[in-house]
């Protein structure tokens, strides 16, 4: 129960702090993620990608623009989730699922999200 509470209150900037202490290359990861953010926001706004229920970006249709950006973002998210999992004594999969809930709560209207059962919907 305590872990759920911890994950429920972790905003994006805290993820950066946690990863900074847990992973030597954290500054580079954070910088890369920040640099990709405008492209990711645009892809979400166009309905090309959404946030899946595991905390990763996923293409929601046939159109796959900027695939290298999506792949790089997911790779860095995986590193972040692993580092947080190590600190929290859990798994990267659990961290990702909790992060997916946080992302869904902060998503903009019209963005694609995947619910816990795998069904895609627009917020």
Where would I find each of the regions flagged by the language model?
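Contiguous, amphipathic alpha-helical segments that mediate oligomerization or scaffolding
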Residues: 81-82
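Amphipathic, charged alpha-helical segments and their helix-to-coil junctions
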Residues: 26-68, 72-75, 86-123
